Swiss-Prot record:
Molecular function per GO: translation elongation factor activity
GO cellular component: cytoplasm
Function: Associates with the EF-Tu.GDP complex and induces the exchange of GDP to GTP. It remains bound to the aminoacyl-tRNA.EF-Tu.GTP complex up to the GTP hydrolysis stage on the ribosome.
Cystine pairs: none
Protein name: Elongation factor Ts
Length: 293
């Protein structure tokens, strides 16, 4: 049995980026052969990544990159809040945003194929899954390239906003981005609100109005009033501006001779169903499995 020294472990770690204990185990299994140990680690890390790939990634971060009139916003997910504070995970998210801004990939597959530190982004992602032991995925991204200006705003790491705008004062764009993060509009104007959201709101309003027992013509007016109110509440231009409750966002833009052409907001995990762990059931299942063994 070969003697495994700290220097051998350090060299293998530098080569593979694997955890120290994993490196030591691999060297022991390979009887001190660094080439075999590297192969063992690649298999183990690959297996670790494959096992993690089926787990839900509802945590994560939003990262952004703005260079001149080009901006990128990306959501990168992981399984636990703990990993969102990991420096390597944060570096991967920021690298994603930079690659998107620089290369304009057509989709997630094209993004994953882009080069990063001598490998592809997808290879770097798989390696990080292997090292951390937790699934992570690039969920979505958007890229703005405009003749005007682009600004991004991150509220912590969980909410990200990017705005395409025209204004003499860049602070206007920053204020609008902060407003969007706070008020969470779903569209620029009432006309842009998705039809499915309007239909859902109308259905709820109809049920509430029907319970009032009022005449049909009154019920119809109540429904239309509710829908109209909803459209004002969820469209950016109609919302009351957070920095001045005496005017709407649209009025503020007119006063400053500014326009907002488009915006995107990402909220981490939005729409992802998180797995609810049942610890008691998990223990019971393990006990039952042990009895059958």
């Amino acid at each position: 049995m070969a003697v495994i020294t700290a220097a051998m472990v350090g060299e293998l770690r530098a080569l593979t980026d694997a955890p120290m204990m994993e490196c030591k185990k691999a060297l022991t299994e390979a009887d001190g052969d660094p080439v075999k140990a590297e192969e063992i680690l690649r298999v183990k890390l690959g297996s670790k990544a494959s096992k993690a790939a089926s787990r839900v990634t509802a945590e994560g971060v939003v990262a952004s990159c703005v260079v001149g009139n080009v901006g990128a916003l990306v959501e990168v997910n992981c399984e636990t809040d703990f990993v969102t504070k990991n420096d390597e995970f944060l570096a991967l998210a920021n690298a994603c945003a930079k690659l998107i801004a620089e290369h304009n990939p057509a989709d997630l597959a094209a993004l994953g194929a882009l080069p990063l530190d001598g490998k592809t982004l997808e290879e770097k992602r798989a390696e990080l899954i292997g090292r951390i032991g937790e699934n992570m995925s690039i969920r979505r991204f958007v890229r703005f390239e405009t003749a005007g200006k682009v600004v991004s705003y991150l509220h912590g790491t969980r909410i990200g906003v990017m705005v395409d705008f025209d204004a003499a004062d860049e602070q206007v764009g920053k204020d609008v981005a902060m407003h969007i993060a706070a008020m969470k509009p779903v569209a620029l104007s009432s006309d842009d609100v998705p039809a499915d959201l309007i239909a859902k709101e109308r259905s709820v309003a109809e049920l509430k109005a029907a319970e009032s027992g009022k005449p049909a013509e009154i019920v119809t007016k109540m429904v239309e009033g509710s829908v109209h109110k909803y459209l004002k509440e969820v469209s950016l231009l109609n919302q009351t501006f957070v920095k001045n409750d005496k005017q709407t966002v649209e009025q503020m833009l007119k006063d400053t001779k500014s326009t907002v052409k488009a915006f995107t907001m990402y909220v981490v995990g939005e729409g992802i169903e998180k797995k609810q762990d049942d610890f008691a059931a998990e223990v019971a299942a393990q006990v039952a499995a042990a009895k059958q063994a």
